[in-house]
Amino acid sequence: MSNHSSSIPELSDNGIRYYQTYNESLSLWPVRCKSFYISTRFGQTHVIASGPEDAPPLVLLHGALFSSTMWYPNIADWSSKYRTYAVDIIGDKNKSIPENVSGTRTDYANWLLDVFDNLGIEKSHMIGLSLGGLHTMNFLLRMPERVKSAAILSPAETFLPFHHDFYKYALGLTASNGVETFLNWMMNDQNVLHPIFVKQFKAGVMWQDGSRNPNPNADGFPYVFTDEELRSARVPILLLLGEHEVIYDPHSALHRASSFVPDIEAEVIKNAGHVLSMEQPTYVNERVMRFFNAETGISR
């Protein structure tokens, strides 16, 4: 992995610890990668690129507090056919350096537009999980000409509001055993995460940084898209939900998505909770690739 320098801000001890654990998590990355920063109107955005440089682009957006390192069980398969760009979402706990992040849906879409432009991406497939799925949906509704197709996994809100249990478990993260309790809840008591990655997640919880925890905004996230917004989607979408999803009822979310989004394939995956790309990576990797291949005519 090669790193391109950027102006890293002064960090607290917990911030330094987080950066160290992030780098340790990259040891789980099974393929060669390049880590670098790109400039946007909203700050320096950290990206992990893998796969052939001349392959079609695929942009990955992670879940909240998980960062781009969460894709370690998936990246080998996806980067075998695509130039993958795992993007650290601005304003979340990761290596991106936020500046002037208002937290509105418009600004988040413009941030991704800057990312695409500065990576030289005219049009790309996208994959987003949880918070990343919400960002993906927001972007493809506003900039459909830049998205070939999108796999949206366990999106945060998007189709349904959070169950009230989400806030109970999220607010308990900093308590004794709060991280373990939260992760077990999210994954139906089958925490499959590598201990190195869990260490990074814990370090992120302990790193209190206001610029990386934007306040909820009526014009921002979380957000449930209206019927009209969902009907306006012009991009092919694959929606994957775990049968043990806890942030909302997966069957109700699938029903609403299928009722309003014009071009959508939707599926509930067995033996998976919220973090299904890490819980059932073999199936998710293949299912997503099959969807993209059908959209572009690429054969396995």
UniProtKB/Swiss-Prot annotation:
Any one Gene Ontology molecular-function term assigned to this protein's record: carboxylesterase activity
Catalytic activity of the protein: a carboxylic ester + H2O = an alcohol + a carboxylate + H(+)
Active-site residues, as the UniProt record annotates them: 274 (proton acceptor)
InterPro entries linked: AB_hydrolase_1, AB_hydrolase_fold, AB_hydrolase_sf
UniProt-listed Pfam families: Abhydrolase_1
EC number, as in UniProt: 3.1.1.1
Gene3D superfamilies: alpha/beta hydrolase (3.40.50.1820)
Keyword annotations from UniProtKB, A to Z: Hydrolase
Annotated site location: Transition state stabilizer: 130
Protein family: Belongs to the AB hydrolase superfamily.
Oligomeric and partner information: Monomer.
UniProt xrefs under PANTHER family: MONOACYLGLYCEROL LIPASE
Name of the protein: Uncharacterized carboxylesterase nap
Source species: Bacillus subtilis (strain 168)
Record lineage: Bacteria, Bacillati, Bacillota, Bacilli, Bacillales
Recorded name of the encoding gene: nap
